[in-house]
């Protein structure tokens, strides 16, 4: 007697390319491409059927047993009585782990010498906010607290990458502090840093305009100090959105900073590009900059919601499309954009990407006045900030951090039937809170990007078979 079988809950269909459609498993991340002639068979499998029945009904389709065997191997076809939620539980056990500290953001200055109107830090500041600079006393306590917590990481302190970000506003407005902190780290935590080797990084994202010879030498002398410069493309588009406070464009000064870094021997410099209407149709021009300056990586940042300016779905559709076009072009030159790459890696390696942001249980942010929180976007209004910096603060026992760590599509019933469940990571929790008042709501702005990327990945794979 033939077994009753059906399509499992996690199977998602992508229709129509060159006479084929795709059946994709949103948790195993397996994909099977089938000719359209099997479409009716799949429809019957959604209802539940038997192999005997299918063989009789589609007697002209000689490969039917083979196709069912392949669908079963990938978990796409299961016995009718299968409990599909068991697989979700298994995946959760592997991928939803307790919080584990990896990243510390020190907001060393929350003001800036530029006036970019899309800045998510400045646009989330309360009215009449007075900007601040971090003191060495605050930074030192934060560093001591960070190192005490690193060794407590239940996920294995040695294996994970650990990064201290010097962040702003414009962090180089407080370079004096950065220098003091780095020297303190190199003196006080010399052994730990040497033991961590490549796993320990310091990092800065800067607008580049304040880079002097002294700063460049300081950065270039350290192999574990990463630097990214914000450039939105060629001069005209960059200057439209990234002017100095006096209105003058900042491109020339940013490029000057980049060149000083190069002259002083800094080899690995990254480019960080924010995508808005000024450059959305010109992303390939970033590759011209890459050919000239040889960036270590190019990261594209879609706008995030701010208290003043929510991002529209129309914008996200366009960004998603342009990012895919850019990714396709850039990979021909061996350049892999990070945000797209995280999903691509998950898809190719068939490994669930449960979180797309370190704020979800792996990151701590210290504001200039020494308040601790999970996400730098909340720095101004101190949203999701919960303690004053103290060397005894226990990251791994904090309830806000524990809740954020749980926020993954694997724990969000709204996501269970989404094709992108396994590769998405859930987008931005802070944006979800801003839009809907809860980190547990779906970041629907980001959904557009995840789903569009998944569909592209499926058909990109097909085109390479
Ligand atoms: S929660 Fe959102 S704004 Fe905060 S760090 Fe994550 S992606 Fe960025
Ligand atoms: S956040 Fe959106 S795209 Fe991601 S899994 Fe949930 S519903 Fe799908």
Label the predicted regions:
Residues 98-99, 103-137:
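Canonical Radical SAM [4Fe-4S] cluster-binding loop centered on the CxxxCxxC motif
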Residues 1-45:
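Acidic, low-complexity/disordered tracts enriched in E/D and polar residues
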Residues 111-122, 374-377, 412-430:
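Local cysteine-cluster metal-coordination motifs and their immediate loop/turn environment
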